[in-house]
Amino acid sequence: MAMKSRYIWLASIGVAISNLIIGMGVGSYYFTDVVGDIAKLSMVTMFTSLNVLAMVIFPVLLKRYSVMQVAAGVAVVGSVGYLINFFAGANMGLLIIGALLGSFAGLPFNYLRSVICMQIADYNEANNMVRMEATLAAVMNFLGKIGSALGSFMVGGLLSMSGYNGALEVQPDSAIFMIRVLYGLVPAIFTILTVLCAVGFRPLDKWTRENEK
């Protein structure tokens, strides 16, 4: 029954993409080979921890917008952040801004997952189907783990194809460019895909609004 719901697939793909980006773990490569100082990664990580403020903002936004509308808006902001990362080079100011904006992208799919499950379950129940909250959560968690694994696999494969060699002190230009692409462009593209997943929820959002009146 869960597999027949397009909404569980859309939500699960959003979770998988968010975890894929996290699983890529390109930051260490970027700050070692592009910035030239791995120690500066900790500074950027410190600023991205500010995204916990979203936990305060989300409840306010959810009073006016649906979870998926919030997810779409945050994903657009995140994609801008990732694009900044691609063009930032070794500019720490831009890297901090880009990383902070990018860190917001996957928060709705990961931290508001239970709300999404409840919305889908309510829809199932109204259409004479089993609510299946536990099944919905399990599908999301499973695809999320697949996303994390794919992120790591993809980075390893693309870096190898670009000529990256961990034994070299200076990487070839092709490897440096690939690291920049993986740190900026690839996450931006995947984040835009989560926007499309959120847009696919419009009929369900409309149904939810009509049934809350």
Per-region residue spans from a language model:
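Membrane-embedded alpha-helical bundles of multi-pass transporters/translocases
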Residues: 1-213
